[in-house]
Amino acid sequence: MDAISLVFGTEKRGIDIPDVSPEFETNVPGIFIAGELGGMGLIRKAAEQGRQAIEVIRKRGGAGDHDHDVVIVGCGPAGLSAGLSAIESKLRYKLIEQEDSLGGAVFHYPRNKIAMTAPVKLALIGKVRFGEVQKEKLLAFWDQVVRKTGLQIGFRECMQAVDKDGDGFIVRTNRGAHRTRNVLLTMGRRGTPRKLEVPGEETPKVVYRLIDPAQYDGQAVLVVGGGDSALEAALALAERPGTEVTLSYRSEAFSRVKQKNRQAIEEAQRDRRLRVELESTVVAIEPEQVQLKTKAGPATLRNQAVIVCAGGLLPTPLLQKIGIRFETKHGTA
């Protein structure tokens, strides 16, 4: 069997990856990166990187006159694993997560999506053996791990800046400031959701992730985006009773999606389970309708909910301000 290689970016479309040493340290001494932000999207590998990074930090010595040995930013697989390892290593840690739940990118997977298919080793827990495990089961397991171990997570706390502080750092968030010897960045590449910047977007009917398709039963829903997450959201909604689904995408084709998703959308469109508007953009969001600009001209759609799946704004500018160097990978391992 041929070996599997991890490839970053494509030949034409590069991806910015932080410059990180084999010990997960950036060019800024004391700031580490593990998991998806560093290019590792596999759950098992991300969790392993989180554990290994904490081991490096443990060997470096104590916090000195700082409040924490390490501030861990992001509670996806890498951050969760790092937090457990910090407890096991008796480090003074602070784990923060900008959203209101753990799981990182996994939390944003569609319902019942297979999330992990390989064993993973977690500090305090040991080796966890899964066959194919769905998103919901994996998140429930992680919740159980948090309760069992007493892992402390600061939810809805978003990193806004990192300033040098003697031989350590001050991590500034929307909740305050944390003095720490080291910083471990384990947030994903989603960043904050990319917004449409159109009138009416601030209304409650606009969301940036699909959590439970059943809550939209019987509604007219607009899904905006052309990636796998947008297509999977539209397909999940189209399965619900009485739901009227329109998928709006600004380009002329779904060129960057999995073949199975493209085929499923084409089939659903043929069966009239959903409507696809390519080369369209949202102009305005109103209480009971949305205004689109389409290749055929202006269009008004009946609407009770808008789900924007337009990706995220990467944290690259913030990290560059901290001093972290990036390199653009084009289809390279």
Explain the meaning of each model-derived region.
Residues 185-201, 312-323:
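Flavin (primarily FAD) binding-site architecture
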Residues 22-94, 209-253, 318-321:
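Rossmann-like dinucleotide/flavin-binding elements
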Residues 1-2, 113-114, 119-120, 133-173, ...:
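A Rossmann-like FAD-binding core segment of flavoenzymes
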